[in-house]
Amino acid sequence: MKIAIFSQDINQDVENVLQSILVHEEASNCNFFIHDNLRQCEINANNFSLFENHENLNESFDLFISIGGDGTFLRSIEFVRNLNLPIIGINTGRLGFLATTKKENLEKSLTKILKKKFSVEKRSLLKVFTENNCIPMDSFPYALNEISVVRKDTTSMINVKTSLDGTYVNSYWSDGLIVSTPTGSTGYSLSCGGPVISPTSNSIVLTPISPHNLNARPLVISDSTKIEISVSGREDFHLLSIDAKIYTVKNETKIYVEKSDFDIQVANINNYNFYKTLKDKLLWGKDKRN
């Protein structure tokens, strides 16, 4: 079994998890490739090689392990891209909607992971591009959670003109607009009043950020919809975020968002269930009146 391992943070929890993986009783059947930034960890093992970027990975790999929180998991897709390589997240962070494998149950979980006893679920991505190529050519313009436009260098509202499949729909006077995948519906969009959507739904959510007009509500659309956005306001520029990546874009620039032509494979163990995760993470059903 050929496995790539990544973490964007170096701390004791990450080092402990990494060490546990490399010395696990099933590790002798695996070839491990750890990301270059993990070489600074104190590892008492030598059964691994290093990788630096997505060009070092290929279809011969069986699994990509992300050690950290959901932010680390989002970074992982930049390495995996369109390889159809399952990603499993071992959670050393906080909430963990994507990194669902708990470090407290690590030994049992690793036995299943290293024996390939996991299920795989497809998650859709969003692709973004702009006129005038505002996004660097060497970047990865895809989002597993959301793409958003927000104001920059001003406390004034911006106007986000939005068209769907070539039809003008609305101009959101607001702090910005979130375009979210079903996976991202439990993230930034949810904090701004958006709905929770099952991650395998064929949907996209448009969620305005603090809209001036209270009738500007979140909108759920088909993921086959082509979205066009342009921003105007008192300042000359606004911010475009693609998951954790942020770019400065000139106002009036047309931004296009659509579903990606490839999916991300999310691996889970222990009979993962999205609705159980909702209950655990959002404390649904915990009210004493229930």
Regions inferred by a protein language model and the residue ranges of each:
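N-terminal glycine-rich "phosphate-gripper" loop used for MgATP/nucleotide binding
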Residues: S66-D70, I77-F79
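Gly/Ser/Thr-rich active-site loops/lids in small-molecule metabolic enzymes
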Residues: N170-S174, V179-N215
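ATP/NTP phosphate-donor binding region
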Residues: M1-L63, I67, E104-S119, F129-P141
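Catalytic core of DAGKc-family lipid kinases
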Residues: R94-D175
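Short glycine/serine/threonine-rich phosphate/pyrophosphate-binding segments
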Residues: V14-E15, T72-S76, T186-S191
